[in-house]
Amino acid sequence: MSLDMKEHPDAEVQKNQVLTLEDWKEKWVTRHISFHQEQGHQLLKKHLDTFLKGQSGLRVFFPLCGKAIEMKWFADRGHTVVGVEISEIGIREFFAEQNLSYTEEPLAEIAGAKVFKSSSGSISLYCCSIFDLPRANIGKFDRIWDRGALVAINPGDHDRYADIILSLLRKEFQYLVAVLSYDPTKHAGPPFYVPSAELKRLFGTKCSMQCLEEVDALEERHKAWGLDYLFEKLYLLTEK
């Protein structure tokens, strides 16, 4: 399949698909977490210099962070990391697997929510829905790394999600987002199909968009979903 055929005409086919927060929590309980990447994200590694621009002391936000090991990468480089994740299991596993001691406390602003902080203070993970997060007043960010977040959000919630992301960006931000391209008539999602036109609709008024790279990401598990092609595209969004 040529890379020119990557925008599927039936992008609307998934628009009514819905997963609840309980569905996502259940994935962690039943270990249906094939979205977790043990070695971290290879495209992020490759484009890390472009993303960080040699700057130090940045605030980096991880939406729907799971137990992404890249959070430790950034903290080890002297950056401050904030993540949000609905599953307490995912958050606890992150600290355990990275051998980081941490504290936990309830969040006064959001009923039932907690914040987990590494003892060094460089990593803070909020256990709540991203749609409740604005109430916690977490400040603004220089960088956002969005892998497995936008593609996991219910398509009907894209606008709400984009509003939150845009509200968290500081001046001169860099927002790096990985999206997937496949035939949405063959797989209901998640991960959901996010065409470039949808990215443009969500972020194009405030952001300039550049596709840094596109790779063939088809694995055996995707073939089992019924897919015969799957591309991952990495976009860098910057201030207009």
From Swiss-Prot:
Quote the EC number.
2.1.1.67
Reaction(s) catalysed by this chain's protein: S-adenosyl-L-methionine + a thiopurine = S-adenosyl-L-homocysteine + a thiopurine S-methylether; mercaptopurine + S-adenosyl-L-methionine = 6-methylthiopurine + S-adenosyl-L-homocysteine + H(+)
Where are the N6-acetyllysine modifications? K53
Q: Which PROSITE patterns match?
A: SAM_MT_TPMT
Asked if Transferase is a keyword of the record, the answer is: yes
**Which residues make up the binding site for substrate?**
F35
What's an example GO cellular component term for this entry?
A: cytoplasm
Q: Name one GO biological process term.
A: methylation
Q: Can you say where in the cell this protein is located?
A: Cytoplasm
GO MF, one annotated term: thiopurine S-methyltransferase activity
Q: Which residues carry this modification: Phosphoserine?
A: S34
Q: Name one Pfam family in it.
A: TPMT
Q: Where does S-adenosyl-L-methionine bind?
A: 24-35, 64, 85, 129-130, 147
Where is it predominantly found?
Answer: cytoplasm
If you read the UniProt record, what top EC class would you report for this enzyme, in one word?
transferase
Keyword vocabulary terms for this entry: Acetylation, Cytoplasm, Methyltransferase, Phosphoprotein, S-adenosyl-L-methionine, Transferase
Q: Output the superkingdom of the source species.
A: Eukaryota
Functional description taken from the UniProt entry: Catalyzes the S-methylation of thiopurine drugs such as 6-mercaptopurine (also called mercaptopurine, 6-MP or its brand name Purinethol) using S-adenosyl-L-methionine as the methyl donor. TPMT activity modulates the cytotoxic effects of thiopurine prodrugs. A natural substrate for this enzyme has yet to be identified.
Q: Its quaternary structure?
A: Monomer.
Matching HAMAP family, A to Z?
A: Thiopur_methtran
Question: Which family, according to the similarity comment?
Answer: Belongs to the class I-like SAM-binding methyltransferase superfamily. TPMT family.
Name of the molecule in the record = Thiopurine S-methyltransferase
Source organism of this protein record? Mus musculus (Mouse)
Q: Tell me the classification of the organism that encodes this protein.
A: Eukaryota, Metazoa, Chordata, Craniata, Vertebrata
